[in-house]
């Protein structure tokens, strides 16, 4: 676990996104951006822990507030599940090109390990075609197409492929008219 302390946020330069102005609400805040990884310890030697997969950032000697936390019990996530060969087309008000009173996400993945989304066509969504949440791990999203989103153009909309999970692979995916076609 990499806690989001005030010192670390300052070190990362993420305390203020207001172009030097005092707009602190735009920056990161302690405790809100903690980074967690789910890994297995392969070996425990003099040099430290050897993990089954790399971390998404390096941890040095100056990162004393980082810690390893044991997860008790069995892995509680669904395993080896997927969605494939499907079309998801959201109905919307055709008289309103900015309609948002309809489906926002096509496939929402949470609490899943070793999952996939394959060969899925998405149409007319307001938000994301695929969302992998923080409790999703080892997810593959491939050969998917997102077309003709219907929503306003603004925050939290049209983030076509949104990855907050870990060890995820997105490949051969296509998106039209997204605000941010891939977000991690």
Task: Give the ranges of each region predicted by the language model.
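Short glycine/acidic-rich loop motifs that flank beta-strands on beta-rich extracellular proteins
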Residues: 92-98, 126-132, 149-159, 167, ...
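Small/polar beta-strand repeat architecture
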Residues: 10-100, 104
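Short, charged beta-turn/beta-strand-edge "cap" motif at the junction between a beta-strand
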Residues: 4-8
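All-beta strand scaffolds that present successive hydrophobic residues in beta-strands
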Residues: 83, 115-119, 138-142, 165-173, ...
């Amino acid at each position: 676990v990499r806690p989001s302390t005030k010192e670390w946020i300052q070190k990362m330069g993420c305390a203020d996104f207001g172009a030097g102005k005092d707009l602190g609400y735009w920056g990161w805040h302690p405790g809100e951006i903690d980074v967690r990884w789910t890994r297995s310890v392969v070996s425990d030697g003099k040099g430290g822990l050897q993990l089954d997969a790399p971390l998404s950032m390096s941890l040095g000697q100056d990162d004393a507030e980082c810690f390893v936390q044991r997860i008790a019990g069995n892995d509680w996530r669904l395993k080896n599940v997927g969605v494939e060969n499907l079309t998801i087309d959201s109905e919307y008000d055709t008289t309103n090109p900015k309609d948002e009173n309809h489906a926002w996400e096509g496939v929402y993945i949470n609490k899943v390990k070793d999952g996939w989304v394959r060969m899925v066509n998405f149409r007319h969504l307001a938000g994301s075609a695929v969302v992998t949440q923080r409790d999703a791990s080892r997810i593959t999203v491939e050969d998917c197409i997102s077309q003709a989103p219907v929503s306003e153009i603004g925050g939290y909309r049209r983030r076509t492929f949104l990855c907050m999970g870990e060890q995820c692979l997105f490949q051969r995916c296509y998106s039209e008219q997204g605000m941010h076609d891939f977000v991690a």
